[in-house]
Amino acid sequence: MPAERPVLLAFASTWEDRAAAFLDRLQTVLPGADIILVAEFPPPREFAGVRWIPWFPRRTLRQNIARIRDELRGCRLAWAALVLDRLLPYWPMRAAALWISRGRLLLFNEQMNHFALRPGDAPQALRFLRWRLRDWIHRQTHPGGWLYTQLWRVRHPRAYLRPLFASIALAAGFHARFWKSLRRAPPLRLPDGGLPDGVSIVIPSRDGRPLLEKLLPALERELGQIPGEILVVDNGSADGTARWLAQEHPAVIAEISSEPLSFSAAVNRGIARARFRHVLLLNNDMEPEPGFLAPLRAAFEEVPELFCATAQIFFPPGRRREETGKAVWRRKRARPDFFVHCIEPVEGENLSPVLYGSGGCSLFDTARLRALGGLDEELRPAYVEDLDLGFRSWRMGWPTVFVSASRVVHHHRATTSRFFKPEELQTWVEINFLRFLLRGAGDAGLFGELWRTAVDRLNWHAAQEPKRPWAMFALRAACRAYRYLRPLPPARMDERLILAAGSGAIAVFPGRRRDPSKPLVFVLSAYTPWPLSHGGAVRMYNLMRRAAEDFDQVLIAFCAGHAAPAREILDICTEVILVEREGSHLRPMTDRPEVVEEHDEPAFHAALQLALRRHQPDLVQMEFTQMGLYADDCRGVPTVLVEHDITLDLYRQLLAERNGWETRQQWQRWERFERQLWRKVDCVVAMSQRDAAMMEGARRVEVIANGVDLERFSPSAEAPEPRRLLFIGSFAHLPNLLGLEAFLRRAWPRLREAGSVLHIISGANPEHFLDLYKDRVQLSLREPQIEWEAYVSDVRPAYRRAEIVIAPLLASAGTNIKILEAMAMGKAIVGTPAAVNGLEIEPGADALIVPSVEAMADAVLGLFENREARTALERSARRKAEACYGWDAIARRQAALYCSLINRPPRAAAS
């Protein structure tokens, strides 16, 4: 931006929807001045000419100011402006505006009236302060204001009870946290001696004879093929259940209590009498489908040290499905929400971890259940016992999984609703959840966080109208926290990882059958390799497909949302584990690169650790640099890091283009992280000899180049469309956007005048990435001679139609698979040196490589006119692809690497 042009620096310290009015108003303040917006989010689309500087709320004030000042280099700041929005004060942003403006600051109110910080605008400033004071007094003296609330409480002294109870509850939690940091029970040990194989079915029942009449015949049929027993705990029934059982079902064992017991006490009586290896806890209002036991039992053969396998729950037709069996810790919780909930299973998933198994339809390991002491009888009369039991088992490293093929129908609260009111049930849930925190959570720091959040939630509910008595009852109970504390044995699993494992972020999908004769390879990836929407996916899928002949594979990958994996992936993997990742700009700047921080997810750590225990792989391969952060979880297993790009090299190139503060910060962090990572893993895979030469200090480096499917991508006999250009590059990759922007600005005007048509394929979610990188790239793709598509499942027709493929990259790391595809299709390629980094390409023979983006216009126009030169490039490109870049040969090099790392000769791996 020319230094002589003035700029208005707008700090959007207001709501996103008010930013448009703010920018509208600024355009009238200094006509002709460029506006630069400092905001969390990009400017609205109608303000395409407004430059954006992102504001990062979790970064320090100093870091944000440094970023803004760097972006203002070469600009003359005429004025800074900010909005004094009462409801969204943004104090750090206000401080930055004051610091950067050096007094040249315009202050706007919510009505977009403004004044400057100068003596001449004192009257306007005083009017604003007077208006704001009147507004403050009005709010304070009306319902919702602090002063109004205090005066109202003086007139209604009982209203002080709620904040008083909340304060006492917080103090009780502080005491409990201190107590937990000091007290520990001895380590837990499993009892000696095995139990016979079979299932003991424990059914608590109170006046449930009509339900048992339907349930017991189905259970007796279920136990016809396996050893087992049915124990009915007759819990204070007055309907003659015990006498009826003796007459109609003499094989059923009846444990009789003359008085009603709590749910935990009743179930524990049944557990104490169980004779078999597994205990099925089943409510009498459950209706199991035939064959529901077999999948539950099979889970214990699949998952080592499994504590519980829980069934999928359905509700009768016409009723809302309140439970699914997939009970998880709520990841995104609004203030009123409870902490756990049930989520819908994903089609095809099985053995996904859940926080706990429903106490009404779950199969347990009897020895482990008894070692934990059964259900906690302090959680009375009912509810939250299963959550407490599941969490305590996870602490011991004993997981709970969801078994989708085991199905039951729940006639919800068919017993409790006959004896208790909904208000009573809600009260028990709330009080027992507090007791669970006190008795089940051992990590003092985590307990403190959860306790504060739980008390805050109850305090909020207790303040609502109409009154919610259950919230006040629970707050009062929280004040007596000391009564329920108990020491816990040392945990074998981090409690924060337990909540992550049981958050619903992990979904497990079985693939093809495991072949024990084949080595097992874990593939950790930032993305799933299908669909083939970017070069990394193309490489992963082609090598995994070929590796599947000699190796079994488990894919653990991030995803934006759970969906059944494509059949193409399930056919080459024994299991696919998908972990949801929710990207966010609300992260502090640490000593690691931003992308690494974004991929450091507790749920992925939990998924990986559980999978390592279950499958015990021979090798772990981490695809993409950021996934190397999980190397520490894989100690004891050979590790391979696949460097699709050397990211520190990419940022070094970006710095050479523009020495910006943000780029410099990220480059410094990549330098530290990437070089440390090379020394940590057993082998680093580079895409080219050029990349391998940079990996100083690595234990071992192997070059396994990118490739192309030579059969799928082959020359076409049909003639291309004259003067048609093709650019393929995912907008998720910033260098693609930077290169395309440079091409459109520096070369495209001449080509457009010559009648060219540019076809752009940008990959999935291009609008998202255009917004994400709006501070770096401004693209205008809406013009007649530009055809723009997002994700295209089959790009071959696009290659066939194109006369020339362009690759105008300014910076690049790794090697470009799209170049290889174009070569295999026999297309003439015009690109910059960065576009062919690391490829064995002879410039002028295999592709036309020009020194700059500007020079691409002449090169393209020349090839349009010179068909012979274009044909020579096309033939040479295809020959080079055939000679050097077929996937089959590349896959053999990868297989040899695997075998060398796991000390198994290739022939043995293939047998």
Would you name each region that the model predicts?
Residues 180-182, 198, 266, 272, ...:
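Acidic/His-rich active-site region of diverse nucleotide-sugar glycosyltransferases
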